[in-house]
């Protein structure tokens, strides 16, 4: 995956993790990356929906609130996701809260994940939560609540990283929780990317190149 939103300041905002400042340039460069990944048999995941470039806080460490108008977010941040919605295998929503749109961070917001991503953008791929162990997610509730909220909001998969005990709690919390459209999720999982035929790949050429490098 690779962030599709322009970045403004430090941490994610002013790093080399975004392609460009212009959303149309981001979309075109993203299209090229998706094409290359698809050729290699790798699904592309766009993040962080709907955009992470309007805040300076690091959501790993703190709450992040984007107070911009919805129209600006849609025109700038969401545009690359809209252009690439049919070619992305997955999308990862952010833990940013967009105050003019919803009271919940995007990862826990049906308004973002269902109304906008699924319905308006017609995204048919998989939705992966961002790490539910991040500080901005912890403010929503305990890990059990976070897990259920993320699934109810529209996440197909939830991530709980770097904390095995929380991962166990998350699994237990959803063991009897109704997971909607399980069969559809599995179908999407195995059909969101066209696996290439390896009959005419350049693997022999690559192996020969590696052999030459190793021999020098």
Predicted regions: what they are:
Residues 3-4, 100, 110, 208:
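Intrinsically disordered, low-complexity regions enriched in small/polar residues
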Residues 203-209:
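Extended, charge-rich helix/loop segments that form flexible
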Residues 23-27:
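A glycine-rich helix N-cap at a beta->alpha junction
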Residues 209-216:
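Charge-patterned, long linear interaction tracts outside catalytic cores
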Residues 1-12:
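Single conserved hydrophobic/aromatic residue that forms the stacking wall/gate
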Residues 15-22:
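Second-shell loop/turn segments in exported
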Residues 28-184, 188-201:
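Second-shell residues forming the walls of enzyme active-site clefts
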């Amino acid at each position: 995956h690779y962030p599709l939103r322009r970045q403004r300041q430090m941490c994610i905002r002013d790093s080399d993790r975004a392609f460009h400042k212009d959303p149309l340039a981001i979309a075109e460069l993203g299209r090229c990356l998706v094409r290359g990944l698809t050729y290699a048999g790798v699904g592309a995941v766009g993040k962080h929906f709907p955009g992470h470039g309007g805040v300076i806080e690091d959501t790993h460490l703190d709450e992040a609130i984007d107070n911009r108008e919805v129209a600006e977010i849609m025109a700038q941040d969401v545009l690359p996701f809209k252009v690439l919605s049919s070619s992305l295998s997955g999308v990862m929503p952010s833990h940013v809260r967009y105050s003019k749109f919803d009271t919940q961070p995007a990862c826990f917001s049906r308004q973002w994940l269902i109304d906008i991503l699924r319905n308006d953008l017609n995204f048919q791929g998989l939705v992966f939560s961002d790490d539910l162990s991040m500080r901005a997610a912890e403010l929503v509730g305990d890990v059990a609540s976070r897990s259920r909220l993320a699934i109810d909001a529209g996440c197909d998969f939830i991530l709980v990283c770097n904390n095995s005990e929380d991962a166990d709690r998350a699994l237990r919390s959803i063991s009897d929780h109704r997971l909607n459209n399980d069969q559809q999720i599995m179908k999407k999982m195995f059909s969101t990317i066209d696996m290439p035929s390896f009959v005419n790949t350049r693997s022999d050429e690559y192996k020969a190149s590696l052999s030459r490098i190793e021999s020098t």
